[in-house]
Swiss-Prot record:
Protein name stated in the entry: Methionine aminopeptidase 2-1
Task performed by this protein: Cotranslationally removes the N-terminal methionine from nascent proteins. The N-terminal methionine is often cleaved when the second residue in the primary sequence is small and uncharged (Met-Ala-, Cys, Gly, Pro, Ser, Thr, or Val).
Recorded family membership: Belongs to the peptidase M24A family. Methionine aminopeptidase eukaryotic type 2 subfamily.
UniProt keyword annotations, A-Z: Aminopeptidase, Cytoplasm, Hydrolase, Metal-binding, Protease
Residues that hold a divalent metal cation 2 according to the record: D227, H296, E329, E424
Organism, scientific name: Talaromyces stipitatus (strain ATCC 10500 / CBS 375.48 / QM 6759 / NRRL 1006)
Biased segments, Basic residues type: 58-73
Enzyme Commission code: 3.4.11.18
Entry note: cofactor: Binds 2 divalent metal cations per subunit. Has a high-affinity and a low affinity metal-binding site. The true nature of the physiological cofactor is under debate. The enzyme is active with cobalt, zinc, manganese or divalent iron ions. Most likely, methionine aminopeptidases function as mononuclear Fe(2+)-metalloproteases under physiological conditions, and the catalytically relevant metal-binding site has been assigned to the histidine-containing high-affinity site.
Chain sites annotated for binding a divalent metal cation 1: D216, D227, E424
Gene Ontology cellular component list: cytoplasm
Catalytic reaction list: Release of N-terminal amino acids, preferentially methionine, from peptides and arylamides
Biased composition (Acidic residues): 33-48
Length: 443
């Protein structure tokens, strides 16, 4: 409408100028009877000026304003391939959900000091928010497009390729994956398997209509890992199981805060989780919190920072502290509520406190060099080594595990025939509020 309104104004101006020109020409015609030749020349000059003014007005009318070039992409592609830095060229990413602390400790610092500390942490927060935006956009696509009949390899690689594209780090050059990309391998744990399962090369497993699949993946910018997970099902019979776990995770987020004891969070989570039950094939199962799985704090380039957030009552009296980052995750099961290591290992990470030992196997030495340059202390899986062109590395990898340099993380499973679910968010304990970095419209 604005362009149309400008045209109408130009027409009115042009008509006004033409009208004035006609009146002036008529007046000049009356005066010519008594005027000499020099006056005729002046009339012609005035008429020429009026015509020139009219022509200029016409040209002005025709001249269209130049359209400003739009900088950067305005929306995400499908599948996601546009780096989020192009969607947010000012590098200001959306805040997560802001949650007030339940019982603010006024003695800690003044409100003004807290606000100052928040401003000082801006770069730190922007890196987390960028990773969170990557996670939200990738999982939005995944939730819409993952269907029964797809292989787990296809699903995992689709998610991982999207994360690498949106962070702008493909991870194929030395050091690139340490700057940004996958925070840890995409976990796709099915049914009784609760965590740490991703397909190795050659895996032919296919997602089935009746499966309960936990999708757990991380995106990082400069080692700021956003760890978030959700559960996918294709049968409403599992709805209560998913609701129980989702509500338990939200309870953990609500209870978390500066100076809060881990044990208190675990008790609140368990109370909510185990208030649910689910009916499957005519049998009613109580939903049990998996007592030997926990949430955890996150350090830079380190997914498990040393503190654990239990999901059952009792135990750890450790407190959360200001400035810490936590992955609040809960797991519910229709089985025993206890997991054991099972199936083929796929997840690995170099130990933070890796011992300086002499390695005899050249394959182990070479592989450690690859791990140091491409992952550091970030978790990786066998497919990532394949992607970097490594082959015949299993002997060397097992040697690094035996030496305590690399930690293996086998899949964790409840009893066969049971179903498990997971929901997880990353939160930052800011001085003034807690920010649920990974929160989205989906969960």
């Amino acid at each position: 409408m604005a362009a149309q309104a400008d045209d109408e104004l130009n027409k009115l101006r042009l008509n006004g100028q033409n009208g004035e020109a006609k009146e002036q020409v008529s007046a000049s015609a009356v005066d010519t009877a008594d005027n000499d030749d020099s006056e005729d020349d002046e009339k012609e000059e005035e008429g020429g000026a009026e015509v020139a003014a009219t022509e200029a007005a016409k040209k002005k009318k025709k001249r269209k304003p130049k359209k400003k070039k739009k900088g950067g992409a305005k929306k995400q592609s499908s599948p996601p391939r546009v780096p989020v830095s192009e969607l947010f060229p000012n590098n200001q990413y959306p805040e997560g959900e802001i949650v007030e602390y339940k019982d603010e400790n006024n003695y800690r610092t003044t409100n003004e000091e807290k606000r100052y500390l928040d401003r000082m942490n801006n770069d730190f927060l922007q890196e987390y928010r960028q990773g969170a935006e990557v996670h939200r956009q990738v999982r939005q696509y995944a939730q819409k497009n993952i269907k029964p009949g797809q292989t787990l390899t296809e699903i995992a690689e689709g998610i991982e390729d999207a994360v690498r594209a949106l962070t702008g780090h493909q991870g194929l050059e030395e050091g690139d994956n340490i700057k940004g990309g996958m925070g840890f391998p995409c976990g796709l744990s099915i049914n009784h398997c609760a965590a740490h399962y991703t397909p190795n090369a050659g895996n032919k497993m296919v997602l089935q209509q009746g499966d309960v699949m936990k999708v757990d993946f991380g995106a990082h910018i400069n080692g700021r890992i956003v760890d978030s997970a959700f559960t996918m099902t294709f049968d409403p019979v599992y709805d209560n199981l998913l609701t129980a776990v989702k509500e338990a995770t939200n309870t953990g987020i609500r209870e978390a805060g500066i100076d809060v004891r881990m044990s208190d969070i675990g008790a609140a989570i368990q109370e909510v989780m185990e208030s649910y039950e689910v009916e499957i094939n005519g049998t009613t199962y109580p939903v049990k919190a998996i007592r030997n799985l926990n949430g955890h704090n996150i350090d830079q380039h380190v997914i498990h920072g040393g503190k654990s957030v239990p999901i059952v009552k009792g135990g750890d009296q450790t407190k959360m502290e200001e400035g810490e980052v936590f992955a609040i995750e809960t797991f519910g099961s229709t089985g025993k509520g206890y997991v054991r290591e099972d199936m083929e290992t796929s997840h690995y990470a170099k130990a933070q406190d890796a011992p300086n030992v002499s390695l005899r196997l050249s394959s182990a030495k070479n592989l450690l060099n690859v791990i140091n340059k491409n992952f550091g202390t970030l978790p990786f899986c066998r497919r990532y080594l394949d992607r970097l062109g490594q082959d015949k590395y299993l002997l060397g990898l097992n040697n690094l595990v035996s030496a305590g340099i690399v930690q293996d993380y086998p899949p964790l499973c409840d009893i066969k025939g049971s179903y498990t679910a997971q929901y997880e968010h990353t939160i930052v304990l800011r001085p003034t509020v807690k920010e649920v970095i990974s929160r989205g419209d989906d969960y």
